[in-house]
């Protein structure tokens, strides 16, 4: 998250740079930049310079081209005069520290230039991977959404990029679609159950082998009756599947797409605002560079005595350069505020999407568990429908059946004898 603008404090000269207390002209004060370079500020005119000012009013002890308006310090790093880039296109912009900015003058010949501290990609500023320490994850052990979707990703379908947040939204919408398709799958399962129950009930009314008699006939009648009982079990199973599995899956988060659309627009608006702020920063940086070049040109004119009005022009150029620096400071501040707001909303929203995904998965898991439970119950009920059949089949007695049939259909028990002559 961005921090507020920081104004460096006055510090004594570091060892090795100035061996004794520096006597500065009235109104001038000495400061250290975050990179350890000393610069000087005139608190009366807001003029800044890298070179120690002399006692002569308006002119520093060293060549004037090194004097400039000092850009703002944000998050501990100075913005530099890098070329502007249109915010609507994907691009990468390196931010160098003040020590690298040619517009702000060079340091002593033996001083090394500082490396880039930040890198800007699609208007979002990140720490430069070569110079900044590794950041601590917000939720290190959880593979959380809030840690892994800050950058944009190249769109495999085209030449553009897809925001990390957009990928999360796509996953949410895909999850909603999967939930809908699961509901449709259960509906097809219900249709199969209903059709199966209908066919079982119809078959149970079939008259085939209805004339079977005896204990086997009773067992056969029970077989047909068990089909009717099983049909009832499957009808109840299909009804419970509809009310306890299919319907909840279909109706879960009915307005989810609308909610996600609002969420998408909210984050997209913040991102657009960030891009607009970034464009303002680049415009202000370009303006500062132009003012500094103008100041340098007028200073060179003074050195070669081209005009009697050059010294007055230099003062005007310095005021304009200072104003340009102030404008850049204000634009960077507004940019950091916009990025901070986007950052906060990203963290809050991605954590909410994470919670919604956990909730969706858990809801589906519970209803699929309900499906398997109903399936187990159906199996038990089906088993109960065949138990009477098993009992009657164990009682089938061919001898008893023969007795009953003979008693009912006998034609006589007197056997024939031989004929007499």
UniProtKB/Swiss-Prot annotation:
Residues 41-52, 95-117 have a biased composition (Polar residues). One of its GO terms (cellular component) is cytoplasm. Transmembrane segments: none annotated. It comes from Mus musculus. The modification Phosphoserine is found at residues 62, 108. PROSITE patterns: F_BAR, WW_DOMAIN_1, WW_DOMAIN_2. Residues 254-328 form a coiled coil. CDD domains: F-BAR_GAS7. This is Growth arrest-specific protein 7. Pfam families: FCH, WW, WW_FCH_linker. It is found in: Cytoplasm. Expressed abundantly in brain with lower levels in heart and testis. In the brain, expressed prominently in the Purkinje layer of the cerebellum, moderately in hippocampus, and less extensively in cerebral cortex and caudate putamen. The keyword Magnesium does not apply. Gene3D superfamilies: 2.20.70.10, Arfaptin homology (AH) domain/BAR domain. May play a role in promoting maturation and morphological differentiation of cerebellar neurons.
